[in-house]
Amino acid sequence: MKQRLSDYVADFLAAHGVTDVFSVVGGGAMHLNDALGHHPALHVTYNHHEQASAIAAEAYARIDNKIAALCVTTGPGGTNALTGVVGAWLDSIPMFVISGQVRYDTTARYAAQFTDGLPLRAVGDQEYDITKSVAPMTKYATMLEDPNQIRYVLEKAWHLATTGRPGPVWIDIPVNYQGGYIETDSLPGYDPAQDDARLPPPVDDATVQMVLEKIRHAKRPVFHAGYGIRLSGGYAAFRAVAEKLNIPIVTYWNAVDLIEDENPLYCGRAGNMGDRPGNWAIQNADLILAVGTRISIRQVGYNWKTWARAAEVIMVDIDRAEMKKHTLHVEHPVWADAKDFLQKLDAAAAPLTPVSQAADWLATCQRWKKDYPAVLPRQWEENGTTANVYAFVRYLSSRLPENSLTAVSNGACCVVGNQAYVIQKGSRMANNSAIASMGYGLPAAIGTCIAGGRRTTICLEGDGSIMMNLQELQTILTNKLPIKIFLINNNGYHSIRLTQNNLFKDHCKIGIGPESGDLSFPEFRKIAEAFGYPYSCAHSNAEMKQVVDAALAAEGPTFCEIFTDTQQVWEPKSATKRLPDGTLVSPPLEDLAPFLPREELEKQMFIPLVPEQ
């Protein structure tokens, strides 16, 4: 059958379950735009910037492991998308990117045969060989140089994006091939055998029994659960086996929504900007079962030799390189798919008797949660001028129903959000922890909302971050998405303000906002009203509660600005400590700032403290 190549691409996506596409149209992708935009099984959301399209596609895939395609044009269309793609790469999110390219006979790649080996930058108008830029941030990146290879490259790209450790793939299609016709019956296909040979083997029974025995005999075991559990499709198995193991569960940023706060097994969030209970569990543990978490530098801290120093670590990961990092000690590396491992662990664990009998240890973790909450009583007190950002995040999240949707931007939104947000049963929170780009919140909320069936979605944004993708306020309205935008206004780039306060006390501030005199922000009331949003704001905790309740009760999108204190520090957090003699040290993760009295900290420890010298 003869078919236009672009229609073949659209049919391929629909046949593989894709229902949504994010795009900014362009001349270099004209036939792709036409085919995707008119396909009966595909809905295209048109953004105002390709970075927003890429971030929306990334956040979309987080909700249910379902891919939304991303279509961009040649030249700046592709380069604009890079931040969203690298975010997906570092957080292992599947993404399927199709870009337009200039006519193949006007590419530098084609012209290379005439230049006697001399490099040529470009030939075509707006030409750029995007695959050279995206190769390090994708599992597969190719320019289609032969139209008859379209089936092969589509099948290979899809397989690699969704198999093993997920990630982005990118197919660059010259515009003359997009509009050309192919004979679909004779197209060669892709055989995944060679690529699949690099996948981990099935988990064997000996490994499962080893893990169960270690847990049975551990006095202070911890289940360190990561986002790879969801990526593998192993969430149901995780919930089932967690009940059987009966050990404290610790999460971190990408994985905070694996378990609700009120679950008796949930202990806390570990890492350099986690909480005290989560870090105390990890630091006191004698056994850590880490599944689907790469245990990043944020989780072990910069004094990583003191991380989990009394624990025997079992790490289950689909990427062997992650278990060999110099920042970790892994006594029992298990190269495996998280779903396969969890299902076999669940099948082998006794259904009625908990594997672990360390009830006192679990009770200790629950005591820590009660005695050392993420939001402190003083943060609920009024200061006369602003709301408290910790109180705001806690109150907002506590008012949400089960199965709610939230997208979190970076800066205050992600730091406080991941410390103080109340995870309700079935709730989802999308945030990008690895690249952590400003501008994430609005487009991530768009992707989250669409993936979640266009249900009400909370967007936590910052006054600095929102400026990076402000134009997406219109995309929300155009598509009638019920997104509640809560803007944390801390008068600029607050995380950088804190860094400058800590490191450059003798210098004036630079580049952070009005106080540095070189960067300013608009009145967001005027911005919201110009776009057509109902606007409200709060300058106190009492006002904050009122505007949160009103926004959640309102129909459709809303814009709420929460003014917060520019002196607010992130707490608790890993921080350099100055000793009485002036020496600067990096404490281990059990010792977070604001620092507790040494005697109080020692009472929480089952192992010796690290000497302060």
Residues of each region from the PLM?
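Phosphate/pyrophosphate-binding active-site segments
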Residues: M1, E145-N148, E213, A311-N410, ...
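N-terminal alpha/beta PP-like core and its mobile active-site loop of ThDP/TPP-dependent enzymes
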Residues: M1-S356, R399, P482-I485, K505-D506, ...
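Active-site diphosphate/adenylate-binding microenvironment
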Residues: S6-V9, A14-T19, G27, L32-L36, ...
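Active-site nucleophile and cofactor-binding loops and adjacent substrate-binding regions
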Residues: V24-G26, T45-I55, L70-G77, E145-D146, ...
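N-terminal cationic-hydrophobic initiation segments that often serve targeting/anchoring roles
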Residues: A61, A161, A242, S397, ...
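Thiamine diphosphate
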Residues: A108-D125, N272, M323-H326, P333-W335, ...
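Conserved short loop/turn motifs at secondary-structure junctions
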Residues: G226-L231, E381-E382, G462
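Hydrophobic, well-ordered secondary-structure segments
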Residues: Q299-N303, A310, L345-T353, D360-Y372, ...
